[in-house]
């Protein structure tokens, strides 16, 4: 396979994995208090640029197939895209890169949760709940994903 095909394939696998993990773990992936385990994949833009659109597509698929309202589909996907772009831009600054999904999803998805699902819960609390779940996925699980992917021989990743 040529490089373009490999890149496209890696992106498709990342998108599918994100959507599948989110849907399989739906009870904890959606709602006021959520830990979206698939968000551990948000470390991948550090290693590969194709992960940026792949994560956004995976999030879009998970939110559409998960039955989310349009407001959540649009702004949840936007939060993931912005976080992935910033993670990629900050790839040489690991701590800052890992914090981007926590920041963007905490603010944007926290607002979505408040306005779409839980208007009785104060907005700052919704943001805090989402950021806490993101922290578990991105700051605890993300480095494990990063370490595992780094162990894959480079010729297998970038053939």
What function would you assign to each model-found segment?
Residues 27-32, 40, 60-159:
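Membrane-embedded alpha-helical hairpins and interfacial helices in multi-pass inner-membrane proteins
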Residues 1-53:
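Hydrophobic transmembrane alpha-helices
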Residues 1-4, 56, 119-120, 124:
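Juxtamembrane loop-helix boundary motifs flanking transmembrane segments in multi-pass membrane proteins
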């Amino acid at each position: 396979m040529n490089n373009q095909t490999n890149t496209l394939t890696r992106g498709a696998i990342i998108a599918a994995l994100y959507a599948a993990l989110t849907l399989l773990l739906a009870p904890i992936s959606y709602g006021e208090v959520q830990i979206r385990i698939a968000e551990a994949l948000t470390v991948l833009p550090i290693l590969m640029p194709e992960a940026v659109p792949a994560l956004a597509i995976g999030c879009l698929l998970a939110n559409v197939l998960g039955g989310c309202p349009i407001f959540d589909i649009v702004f949840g996907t936007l939060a993931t895209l912005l976080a992935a772009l910033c993670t990629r831009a900050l790839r040489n600054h690991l701590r800052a890169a890992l914090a981007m999904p926590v920041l963007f999803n905490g603010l944007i998805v926290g607002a979505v949760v408040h306005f779409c699902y839980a208007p009785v819960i104060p907005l700052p609390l919704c943001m805090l709940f989402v950021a806490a779940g993101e922290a578990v996925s991105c700051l605890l699980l993300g480095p494990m994903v990063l370490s595992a992917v780094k162990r894959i021989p480079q010729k297998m990743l970038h053939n």
